[in-house]
Structure formats: C-alpha cells, structure tokens
Amino acid sequence: MSYVTQYGLNVPQSEAATYMDGPCLVLAGAGSGKTRVITQKIAHLIEHCGYDAKHIAALTFTNKAAMEMQERIAKLLKEPKKAKQLTVSTFHSLGVKILRSEAHELGLKDRFSIMDSDDCFSLVQDLAATTDKQLIRRIQGAMSLWKNGLIDPESALRTAANEDDVQAARIYRSYVATLSAYQAVDFDDLIRLPVELFRSNEAVRDKWQRKLRYLLVDEYQDTNTCQYELVKLLVTGIGKKPMFTAVGDDDQAIYAWRGATIENLKQLQIDFPDLKLIKLEQNYRSSTRILQAANAVISNNPKLFEKQLWSEHGLGDPVKVMAMPDDDEEAEQIAIMISAHRFERRAKFSDYAILYRGNHQGRVIEQALRKERIPYTISGGQSFFDRAEIKDIISYLRLIANQDDDPAFIRAVTTPKRGVGQSTLEVLGAFAGQWQISLFEAVFKGGIEAKLPQRQLAPLRSFANFINQLEARATRVGRASSGDNAAQVLDDMMKEINYEYYLYDAFEDRQAQSKWQNVLDFTSWLKEKGNGGKDGSDPEKSLLDLTQMVALMTMLEGRDEEPDAVRMSTLHASKGLEFPHVFLVGVEEGILPHKGDPDAPFETLGARIEEERRLMYVGITRAQRTLHVSWCKKRKRARESVHCDVSRFIKEMKLDEGDAVPTEAEIITPQNRLANLKALLQKPRPGNADLTTEPEKLK
C-alpha cells in the first residue's frame, strides 16, 4: 500500500517521506504539511528502512516544535517508546549534547556554564566600559554575526572597516577570553564550538557521524553559516553517502538580522550535486483568495525556486483592506469587529490574531481590547526562565555545577543578602584578577585575609562552603550508595537560603506570593526531571545536567494550555502559527516595510525590502478563513501625530477594488453599532462553534 493511500499524503508529500537515494531538499510552502512529512519520514526510516531510532536526528528551531514533533512520531510507530531514542531537538540543544560529551577536547569542564542574555550584556558592558545600552547591543550583534559566520576575533580585527568595528573586535577578543576563564559559553558558542571541533578533530567527527546516520533539518531557510557548516560536517565524509533531508521555504526567510542566510538553500545544490528537489505547493490552511494575495505579494521578490501555493478550500471571503484615520481608530475598530464577529459566529477568542511589525504597535491595541473586555495574550512575552526569581535560583545551580562561573557567583552571593556588599566584591574581584582565578577560588586563596577583614570574609567563606556541600551532594544524586535525591538537595538549598522570606521582605505580599509560586513550580519541575525524568529512565537528566539545559528552555513542559484569548503577536513570533481570522495592522511605509537600520551589516536596500516582503507573506499566510489588513493615515510617534503612506505591499496584493475596501456597513461606528447588534440578534446563528460553516460577511 502506498503512502498516498495508507497515510493520506498527497503525491509530493509521499515522495518526500519515502525518498532514500541521497540528500533531499523539500521546498514546503506555508501550510503545506511539512511537519507531517518530517514525522512520516522518520517513521518510514524506522519501520521500513531498518534505521535504529538512536541514529536519527531531527533539528528544529524551537523547543516547542521539537516536543510536538517527538509526540507525533511516537503515535506513528508500532513501538512508541522508540521515539524516546530519537534526537529531536534544536540546533543549540544538539550543540550542548556534543559539547557535554566532548568538553575535554575543547578544554572545557564537563559542567561548563551557559551564559544567559543578561550575563552576556553585563559582560560586554564591563568590557566596553559604557552604560550606553544601544552601543552594547550593537557590539553584541556584531559579535553574534562574527560567531555565526565563523569569524574569530583576530580575523574580525583584520577586516575591521572603521574605528567602531576595531573597538567591537577588541571587545570581542576580550569577551572570548573572559568566557574561557569562566569555563562558560554563550548561545552562539553552542554551535560554533562543535563546528570548530569537527573541523579540527576527525576522530570526534567520525564518532558523531556514526551516532547520527540520518539527519533531518526543519526551517532550513533560517539557518546561518555556522548551522549549515554543522550540517555539512555531520553528513559528509570520505566514502560516506550524504543522507539527510532539509525542509524549508525561501519565501519565509525572515531572520537575516540574526545571521540567517537564504543563500543556504541555494548552496545545497552546489555542495550536493545529487540533491533531490521536491516541492510542496498544496496549502491545507487558507482559502484561495488569501493565497492569491500572498502569491501576488511574494512574486515581486526574485525567486530562488519557482513555487505557487494553491488550495482546495474554495475562494473564501474577500481580503479586506481598511484605511483608518489614526492608530486609535484602527485599534478600536479591530476590537469592535472581533467582538461582533465572535458573537455572530459563537467563535472562540482564540480564533483571532492581531499581527504587527513591532511590539510598540501593540500598546494602543491592548487598550482597545481591554475597553471591549476582550481577553488577549501576547506572543514573544517574557519567558518563564527569564523571570528574576527563576534566574536567582538558577544562579545557585550554575555555581554548584561550575565554580568558575563568576556571573552566577555574583548573583547568588548577593541574593538574598548575606552581608556581602559591592565594596567586598570589588576587593575580591581585584584579588581574583591579580591571580587569574575565579571569584569562588579567590575566597579560599592564601593572601585574601590581608585584603579583606574577617567580618567581610566570613560570609563569603560560609557561602562558598555551602556551595561546596551542595555540589558534593548533587554529584552523588542517583548513585545507589547515596541516600540523597534531587528533591532533598533542592529542598535543603531553598531552606538554607530562605528565599521565601527574602521575597516577602523585598516585595509586597501579592507580588511575593506570585514570585514564590513561580519558584515552587520551577523546583517541582527540577525535582521531577533531576532524578532522570518521570520514570527515571533518562540518565542524562541529572540535576546538574539540567542546569546546562535550562538556559535553552523557553517554557515549562506541561504548563497550562493556551487560554481562550485573542493572540497579539509580532509577525516574527507568529511564524508557524495559524488562526481562522487574522488582522494584519499597521501596513504602512516605514513600518511594513520597516525603515530598517542603516548600520545593520547585512542590509542593502533591496535585501531589506525583500525580507520585509517575506514578512508580509508570512503574515498573510497565517490566516485560514478571513484576513483584514489595515493602515493608518496618521500614527502617533514620540507623542506626535505623523502622516503615513499606505504600504507598497498592499498595492502588491492586487486585490479587486470592490472587495478590498469594506462597505460603510462593515466599518462599525458609534452610530451604526447598535443597529448592527440588533441585526445580529435577529439573525439565525450557526449551531456549532467550530467555524466550519460557509463563511458569511463580517458585520
């Protein structure tokens, strides 16, 4: 039985899922079922091609996508437990796995630290001796692009085009040296260091090629130079037939600003002449009218590959364009339309999304939604692991795992307060710098007594001894001879530092209660995972191993499902999502397309507009049933009302003029709102709330 009939795949999907004669590139248009193809292919490799699950790796760009993919694969396998043997992870999680296994080859401790964004910002701030946040971020951006482009500090210095570049390259050199002293890596190092290791050590590279015999890469258009090089190093070798499948869409490449290069798709055909190209063009998400608008916009970009999305969902509702007097009116109109449309259809709030180019556009929309009492969530908000109270606890775990981690030492020793002030840390830091040792080691180094009086040294040594005791216990967790477990170690740590008391002392009761509940949720998760997972079967998930992984996580597993609320999101954060009804707002020149940063290294005017056009395409293709695109004739900027021009992208949608502009009845004003409500009450409504009935006009 073919995959077409057995699993309901269309012909190109089936071909992609079963192709096994070498490297394969699947060009998967928006909504074309790419995740289904990847999961079916992995099942095919295991069930029909004799691959052991432990020799297959699938790489994604988010932890959520990786978890969902693994769950779907388990449902396809005759033995679902085999899914646990797969490597389904982000690029960065795979990098951690490689570095943890090969740390000694790179001069790293097994328990190296992973610096979070705040740590990296503070380090650059210290090295640059500036408090200019914009300058610090520019330097960070330059260093990230250098690392992702596999450019070392000396090469960056040699190619510096101006004095600003020279300054950034010098800071880059000091930054790399400081991380090495901390026995720490940053986010970009998690891929850069494995690439450098595989290039320089053939034996290690061969070992990992034997471990990972088939590689699948999702969202290939979002890979940077470093990630592409890692893929090549894993799949190529003397006498080795490259076995991998890359899945991507050149029309959805929207991350050039963080080093991704769309050229990686093209480069595949050069580096792998036998590459099989398969196109997925049938869209299972959107109506024909929505796809026509998307195809019309993206046709203005030069094409790496010809591709035309189509759908069997029928024409659907016309795409509407709304020209609003200002952003207040835009926000109010959208809120009222959502309220009316939801009432008419008995729809859920979660069926609606409001998408915009930048976070700043969301503020006025939030006010309008609150006025209409419409619940909403904001994508791309603060990660659970970015909360201050969680970072406080993580700093202890990082220090237990790696006593050379100076940023973790500084945060932990000062939170909660234990009599260690800034002056004490300055003296300790100077002493540690003199001897080229960590702050932790300096606490016990001979000669420190001459620098710090006993009253200042005593709390430091008490703290350091406490960390040493916890480290010894955490190392023993899981051993048969040890009575300790992760829960006991964590409970004793929390009791000793008295963090709950600190919260209620430092914050008002309601805020302290919320923060403490977050800490309890986090420690509960650690207790479960730190003993080898729910069933204790994962030896890699010891308490100290988890300390390394926490830096990569964006959410707790098993937290509450998405609430019934309107989704507000930037266009970048909306990628991969879909909604029955979408409002795409602020489609004006200077916003979408964005005016851009003239100092951004990757930007030329043409490249920037092309990427912005792809962003518009991503926004359009999030919509399943209805799409409203709005722009304002005036918009508030820095408390001033400025004139705005309609975006070129609206013109490029090539909408029929009669369809594109809402009728007077469709624009809800205070005068006609009551009449509209009466009409809705008199109108027969659908008998169910699943929005599967024939679309009606939005009133």
What are these regions (language model features)?
Residues 26, 30-38, 42, 103, ...:
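Helicase P-loop NTPase motor core
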Residues 1-2, 657-699:
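Acidic, low-complexity intrinsically disordered tails
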Residues 161, 362-374, 387, 394-656:
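Conserved helicase C-terminal RecA-like lobe
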Residues 15-21:
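Phosphate-binding P-loop
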Residues 2-11, 24, 44, 225-327:
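Conserved RecA-like helicase ATPase core segment
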Residues 2-4, 21-24, 43-214, 238-245, ...:
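A basic/glycine-biased coupling hinge at the interface between accessory DNA-binding modules
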Residues 216-223, 247-248, 584:
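Hydrophobic residues in beta-strands of the RecA-like P-loop NTPase core, especially within AAA+ ATPase
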